[in-house]
């Protein structure tokens, strides 16, 4: 059973003006942006609203500094007017949107609009509309609320579709039964919100979600990859992935993917190893793909249209997994470990360190991550040539042999390297 809403939420369910919440929940720089935007909108006879997730999170008393402003009028022109003195701007005229970089914060401006979809999975066709139509195009009722920024209604909460009531009941509800057909990526968004906010997906919404899972086949690889990136930015992405696996959603990324207790434990360990940072997209993806075959990894790479560096992480992970048995032998020399792992992406090595079942293999992988990969001879190519090594491929060969000697503990100083090189040169005569 879900816990009852906090007193703070109950209070806000009764209060319909959030002016105080705005002041308490946003930094002064963003309040300044809202005030400047509202003033300019009033001068131009436009109505301006704060919408979406930030309104939801104000009611939940959760931090959210991503501001979305909707203008009943020309949002791009309004943003350009603000950008003239205090901000940088990026515009997208096709979608009637603009993004301001205001005092280091990102603020999105959108013309109130309605949307239609030519086919499932397509990007929407947009046309100017009312605030009500703009809110109706949102994914869930809890994200379909607005706060007026007009001087005569400042802070007034606008809730046409029952978002406050669903917040109170901790429910995620779509606005109409074709929502997932129009945009199947809302399935992934719903799972993220469900786990992040500890909400439940409303019964009809869950039935429609299950019904429309095949619609994910209409979504491009680029958009699916973006949804996975968003999952990995969650505090506990494994919860989202396990829920997606439970519902059959994860298989639409690739039929061989699985999210279970094994993955949950590895993701948690990845976060501990990555402190104070968060794990990279590549590391999380490498762990998710760790149990896939090489051929299955190729399918995942193609399906998600992964960039070349990230694709290499996935391929390196598959290659490493194939070598885990070799790395499980305690007697292999450090130089051999180096040769097996050198040139592979660090994210793949880290993933194998986390995922490998063999303690010996993990020890070899840890040794490479923390020590072996940094080892190199003191002597350089010029030193070798001055000592009699002929220019050409022999220089590289001797440098590699010196590195191996360092790795295996045969030498520990420049003088030792020089002595060993003279010995090798004497043998070559």
What do the PLM-derived regions correspond to, one by one?
Residues 2-429:
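Catalytic cores of the polymerase beta-like nucleotidyltransferase superfamily
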């Amino acid at each position: 059973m879900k816990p009852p809403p906090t007193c703070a939420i109950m209070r806000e369910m009764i209060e319909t003006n959030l002016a105080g919440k705005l002041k308490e929940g946003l930094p002064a720089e963003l309040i300044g942006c809202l005030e400047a935007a509202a003033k300019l909108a009033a001068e131009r006879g436009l109505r301006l609203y704060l919408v979406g997730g930030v309104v939801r999170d104000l009611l939940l008393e959760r931090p959210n500094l991503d501001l979305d402003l909707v203008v009943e009028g020309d949002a791009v022109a309004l943003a350009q007017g603000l950008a003239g003195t205090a901000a940088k701007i990026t515009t997208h005229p096709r979608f009637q949107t603009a993004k301001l970089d205001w005092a280091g914060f990102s603020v999105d401006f959108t013309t109130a609009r309605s949307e239609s979809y030519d086919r499932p999975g397509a990007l929407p066709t947009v046309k100017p509309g009312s605030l009500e139509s703009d809110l109706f195009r949102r994914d869930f009722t809890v994200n379909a609320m607005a706060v007026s920024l007009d001087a005569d209604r400042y802070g007034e909460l606008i809730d046409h579709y029952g978002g406050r009531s669903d917040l109170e009941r901790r429910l995620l509800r779509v606005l109409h039964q074709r929502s997932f057909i129009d945009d199947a990526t809302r399935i992934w968004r719903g799972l993220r919100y469900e786990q992040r906010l500890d909400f439940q997906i409303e019964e009809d919404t869950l039935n429609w979600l299950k019904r429309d899972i095949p619609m994910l086949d209409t979504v491009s690889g680029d958009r699916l990859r973006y949804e996975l990136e968003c999952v990995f930015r969650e505090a506990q992405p494994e919860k989202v992935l396990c829920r997606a696996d439970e519902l059959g959603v994860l298989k639409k990324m690739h039929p061989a993917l699985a999210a279970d207790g094994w993955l949950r434990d590895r993701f948690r360990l990845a976060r501990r190893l990555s402190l104070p940072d968060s794990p990279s997209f590549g590391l999380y993806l490498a762990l998710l793909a760790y149990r896939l075959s090489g051929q299955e990894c190729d399918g995942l790479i193609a399906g998600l249209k992964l960039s070349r560096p990230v694709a290499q992480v996935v391929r390196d992970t598959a290659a490493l997994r194939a070598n885990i048995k070799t790395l499980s032998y305690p007697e292999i020399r450090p130089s051999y470990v180096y040769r097996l792992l050198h040139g592979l992406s660090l994210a793949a090595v880290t993933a194998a360190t986390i995922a490998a079942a063999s303690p010996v293999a993990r020890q070899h992988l840890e040794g490479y991550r923390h020590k072996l990969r940094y080892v190199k001879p003191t002597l350089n190519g010029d030193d070798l040539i001055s000592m009699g090594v002929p220019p050409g491929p022999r220089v590289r060969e001797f440098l590699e042999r010196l590195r191996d000697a360092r790795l295996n503990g045969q030498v520990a100083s420049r003088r030792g390297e020089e002595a060993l090189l003279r010995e090798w040169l004497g043998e070559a005569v």
